């Protein structure tokens, strides 16, 4: 068997096995980790979008909290600052302004500066183009203005 076929089979086996690794922890443990991630980023508060989702789409909310937050966001290897900058860049690049805004808010909450977020937008021009970066800049400008007004 050729090496690339073996590599392909191994990749397929690992891809199937990966979701089962998350099952080693109970859903309750994963949800607790997810809740802890959100609260660590959101000044000890829950996330309003996630809380609204619980009302109408409980399965989606639980999956988001257990998998995205409890399994992925709580992994070692990257600090919260790096994760948030990556999330802002990714959401800006795909044009998901609402999610980008949430993660930019988290980034500001944990000490990322407005200037650093602006640099992320500048970087987005390279892989995603100016229209996506301009849209992201508008969203960040709104967020910055709201946060400045809310300060005493």
Question: Which role does the model predict for each range below?
Answer:
Residues 22-81, 109, 133-152:
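Acidic, glycine/proline-rich low-complexity segments that act as flexible tails and inter-domain linkers
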Residues 62-65, 94-100:
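Short acidic alpha-helix initiation/capping motifs at coil-to-helix transition points
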Residues 9-19:
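Bacterial N-terminal signal peptides
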């Amino acid at each position: 068997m050729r090496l690339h076929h073996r590599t392909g089979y191994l990749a397929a086996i690992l891809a199937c096995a990966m979701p089962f690794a998350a099952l080693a922890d109970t859903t309750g443990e994963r949800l607790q980790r997810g809740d802890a991630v959100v609260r660590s980023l959101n000044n000890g508060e829950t996330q309003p979008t996630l809380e609204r989702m619980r009302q109408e789409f409980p399965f989606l909310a639980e999956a988001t909290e257990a998998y995205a937050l409890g399994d992925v966001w709580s992994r070692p290897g990257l600090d919260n600052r790096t994760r948030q900058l990556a999330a802002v860049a990714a959401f800006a690049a795909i044009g998901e302004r609402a999610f980008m805004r949430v993660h930019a808010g988290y980034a500001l909450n944990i000490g990322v500066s407005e200037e650093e977020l602006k640099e992320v937008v500048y970087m987005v021009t390279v892989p995603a183009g100016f229209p996506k970066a301009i849209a992201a800049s508008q969203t960040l400008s709104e967020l910055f203005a709201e946060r400045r007004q809310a300060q005493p």
